[in-house]
């Protein structure tokens, strides 16, 4: 388990990129993370290309705080590359037949588990299993950080919830303020520059008719720090004589 995790999603699906299917994983994962006080650092939608999958997995692995959910490619067909690539990147290329996974597959399919379905029990070394509520063929995780689930949402979603509940149930509370400034971003850039670089900050410009407004969001885990810089920003806006509307003060 990672103490200060950065969450990533890798959605493997040529059929999403060519328009044959719509992605349902990003929105679901985001919702489950936000419910627990987490958020994603990055999300990738990529083709079923083992070389490129390896590059993306290695990129995620370089972040020492990374926690990844990979969707798709863990079935039994020739274009399911995820188990092999995951083993190469996350367990030194070692794949072993997971006895519990094999038992689940045989119990589910009987004689029809052979010769192909049993290959879904060949997992990266020391994998943990994630329950499949649809057909009992498990997803898996490595190092309590890198989780691999099917591309089918009805299977994947329960596994995501299981992994989060087991290993990343809840973050410490994040404090924030959110308000509208009735000006362009250009008018308040100097105020923005005054904020500490390590503070979470975003500005979202919008148009209401022909008028420009900016939605400001400031957040941090330190309550007093958030209060200080939210009040600073608002007071500087007031000093410039610019109207503002407070949406929320959570500190």
Residue ranges and their predicted role:
Residues 2-43, 47-48, 227-228:
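Glycine-rich phosphate/diphosphate-binding loop of Rossmann-like nucleotide-binding domains
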Residues 27-89:
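N-terminal small/polar loop signature for handling phosphorylated ligands or for N-terminal nucleophile
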Residues 12-14, 70-78, 219-221:
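Glycine-rich beta-strand-to-loop/alpha-helix junction loops that act as flexible
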Residues 4, 64-65, 211-213:
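A general structural motif
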Residues 236-251:
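Conserved short beta-strand edge segments in small beta-sheet-based binding/regulatory domains
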Residues 144-236:
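An accessory alpha-helical subdomain
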Residues 51-55, 62, 81-170:
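Proline/glycine-rich low-complexity loops and linkers
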């Amino acid at each position: 388990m990672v103490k200060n995790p950065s969450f990533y999603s890798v959605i493997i699906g040529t059929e999403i990129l060519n328009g044959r299917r719509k992605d349902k994983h990003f929105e679901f994962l985001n919702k489950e993370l936000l419910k627990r006080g987490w958020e994603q650092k990055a999300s990738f939608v990529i083709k079923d290309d083992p070389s490129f999958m390896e590059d993306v997995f290695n990129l995620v692995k370089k972040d020492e705080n990374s926690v990844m959910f990979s969707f798709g490619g863990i079935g039994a067909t020739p274009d399911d590359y995820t188990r092999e690539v995951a083993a190469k990147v996350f367990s030194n290329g070692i794949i072993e037949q997971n006895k519990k996974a094999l038992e689940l597959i045989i119990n589910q399919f009987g004689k029809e588990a052979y010769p192909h379905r049993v290959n879904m029990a060949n997992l990266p070394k020391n994998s943990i299993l994630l329950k499949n509520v649809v057909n009992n063929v498990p997803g898996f995780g490595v190092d309590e950080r890198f989780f691999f689930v099917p591309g089918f949402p009805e299977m994947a979603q329960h596994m995501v919830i299981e992994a989060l509940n087991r290993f990343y149930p809840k973050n410490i509370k994040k404090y924030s303020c959110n308000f509208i400034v009735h000006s362009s971003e250009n008018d308040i850039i100097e105020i923005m520059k005054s904020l500490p670089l390590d503070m979470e900050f975003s500005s979202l410009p919008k148009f209401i008719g022909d008028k420009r407004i900016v939605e400001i969001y400031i957040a941090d885990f330190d309550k007093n720090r958030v209060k200080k810089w939210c009040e600073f920003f608002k007071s500087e806006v007031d000093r410039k004589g610019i109207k503002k509307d407070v949406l929320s003060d959570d500190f």
